């Protein structure tokens, strides 16, 4: 056991991705008036909560991770950390993260983090991931919480913008996850995990990807139409979203489903990154947007 194991078991890649969306939500609510001390507290607090959830997930999935090529070398599978130590580590990370959000931000942001944590660890990892094809849908709510946490940490209000962020990022999670399930089809099949491509076929997953990307594109526009983001954000959201939709539609003609799914997955990351950046740098008040339309 080494320091590397303590880092690896938290899934740093997932933490980094969540930090980007937390920042997007935070800067969207800040509207150019950034409290960097608060920002640091929110980023660290959310990262600790996400890390805690990932460690608990490693503990829960240790019996199936050895069956999957992409997870067979995880710390718990290789015996790099004992189960009791991992559980203690996960608990300490969670307590530290929730406490930081509650004390340095506000109870609302800590509550949002708690909801995301319960959904991911309790409903998804412990139950639905292995039992239902709808596990991905339920799990998407946890993946959508980080930008909401960032937004609520500043606004201290669960308003229309927070709802829009929750819907946007939940919808984004679905095609992103289905694409992974397609190019990792053999892994999920070997572990008997009923993701959509395994349970109902790749064609069914392709149809769902197109529908969810379309819904995502429409949802992204609501930040500007609702008066929370500017026209620069709108232009980027529309361009990225429509191209992602074009890629998704191309799945019906794809000769290599795995190759196509990897492209859809890769562009999904570019899309959510671009939107997180733009909603942070091009946030506006409703009055600003209305004045723009009036000119």
Curated annotation (Swiss-Prot):
Similarity comment: Belongs to the UbiA prenyltransferase family.
GO biological process, one term: heme O biosynthetic process
Source species, domain of life: Bacteria
GO cellular component: a single term: plasma membrane
Compartment annotation: Cell inner membrane
Cytoplasmic side: 1-9, 57-78, 127-197, 248-268
Gene name for this UniProt entry: cyoE
Entry EC no(s): 2.5.1.141
Chief localization: membrane
Needed cofactors: Mg(2+); Ca(2+)
Bilayer topology term: Multi-pass membrane protein
Classification via PROSITE patterns: UBIA (PS00943)
Name the UniProt record assigns to this protein: Protoheme IX farnesyltransferase
Signal peptide: none
């Amino acid at each position: 056991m080494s320091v590397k194991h303590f880092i690896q078991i938290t899934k740093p890649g997932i933490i980094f991705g969540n930090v980007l969306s937390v920042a997007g939500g935070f800067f969207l609510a800040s509207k150019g008036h950034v409290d960097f001390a608060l920002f640091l507290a929110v980023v660290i607090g959310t990262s600790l909560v996400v890390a805690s959830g990932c460690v608990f997930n490693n503990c829960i999935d240790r019996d199936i991770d050895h069956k999957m090529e992409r997870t067979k070398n995880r710390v718990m599978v290789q015996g790099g950390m004992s189960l009791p130590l991992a559980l203690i580590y996960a608990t300490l990370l969670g307590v530290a993260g929730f406490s930081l959000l509650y004390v340095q931000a506000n109870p609302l942001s800590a509550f949002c983090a708690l909801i995301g944590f319960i959904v991911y660890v309790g409903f998804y990892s412990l139950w639905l991931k292995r039992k239902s094809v709808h596990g991905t849908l339920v799990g998407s709510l946890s993946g959508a919480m980080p930008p909401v946490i960032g937004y609520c940490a500043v606004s201290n209000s669960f308003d229309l913008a927070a709802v829009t962020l929750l819907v946007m990022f939940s919808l984004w999670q679905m095609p992103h996850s289905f694409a992974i399930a397609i190019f990792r089809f053999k892994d999920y099949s070997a572990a008997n995990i009923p993701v959509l491509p395994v349970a109902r076929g790749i064609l069914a997953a392709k149809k769902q990807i197109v529908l969810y990307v379309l819904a995502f594109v429409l949802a992204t526009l609501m930040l500007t139409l609702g008066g929370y983001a500017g026209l620069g954000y709108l232009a980027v959201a529309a361009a990225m979203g429509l191209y992602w939709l074009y890629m998704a539609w191309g799945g019906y003609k794809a000769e290599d489903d795995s190759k196509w799914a990897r492209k859809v997955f890769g562009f999904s990351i570019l899309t959510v990154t671009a939107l997180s950046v733009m909603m942070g740098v091009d946030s506006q008040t409703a009055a600003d947007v209305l004045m723009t339309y009036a000119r």
